[in-house]
């Protein structure tokens, strides 16, 4: 029997934990891949970043070698044609130093998902050094701050978003950062033009999902292993 030193045992344990998490990530057959083929994403539309009713150039997003990539065209959403109500959404995302993205949740096909649906913010800390807590990665934009910051700059970051009724749970890199009842958030939030947007509790309970590209300096948004499971 080989005895590992303390540091070796800790490293081996960490490797086992990571392997178990990876196997759990891959095991559930109820999940459907969102981008199973290379090329233009099928079942998705490209729109402008502040109004999903306004189309943008389709070539702004594409899948290559299993990775969804934004083009240099800043200010777009890639939005699902399908609507979702209760679901688990999992994906990995990678941004560069001035990266800014987001995840549309239950968004209508008009208006700004950040205020007319919900947007889970994903942004490098260097994108906006004056950002409020609810504008940081893992926050429901300008409405619900995450409990902690575990975003890893310029690395692949793994998200699990679970929405069932008003309950939202968000796990980032195996850390729970949101576990809230959205029905408790009854205060309006300010849009970019200073007008009031509806409180989170009054946002739609069903809608579209999407991924945003708002990075600076032509820096891309990269997404892989994106999949979704609808909940009954």
List where the protein language model places each region:
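Carbohydrate-interacting regions of secretory-pathway proteins
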Residues: 25-232
């Amino acid at each position: 029997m080989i005895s590992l030193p303390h540091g070796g045992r800790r490293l081996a344990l960490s490797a086992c934990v990571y392997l178990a998490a990876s196997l759990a990530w891959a095991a559930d057959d109820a999940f459907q891949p969102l981008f199973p083929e290379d090329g233009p994403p099928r079942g998705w539309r490209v729109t402008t970043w502040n109004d999903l009713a306004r189309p943008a150039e389709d070539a702004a997003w594409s899948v290559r070698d299993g990775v969804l990539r934004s083009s240099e065209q800043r200010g777009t959403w890639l939005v699902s044609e399908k609507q979702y109500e209760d679901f688990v959404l999992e994906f990995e995302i990678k941004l560069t130093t001035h990266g800014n993205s987001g995840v549309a949740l239950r968004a209508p096909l008009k208006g700004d998902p950040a205020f007319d649906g919900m947007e889970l913010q994903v942004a490098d800390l260097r994108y906006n050094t004056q950002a409020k807590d609810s504008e940081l990665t893992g926050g429901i934009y300008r409405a619900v701050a995450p409990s902690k910051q575990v975003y890893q700059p310029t690395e692949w970051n793994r998200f699990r978003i679970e929405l069932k009724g008003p309950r939202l749970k968000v796990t980032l890199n195996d850390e729970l950062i949101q576990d809230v009842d959205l029905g408790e958030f009854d205060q309006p939030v300010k849009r970019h033009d200073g007008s009031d947007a509806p409180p989170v509790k009054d946002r739609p309970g069903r809608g579209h999902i999407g991924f945003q590209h708002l990075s600076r300096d032509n820096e891309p948004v990269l997404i892989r292993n994106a999949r979704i499971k609808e909940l009954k």
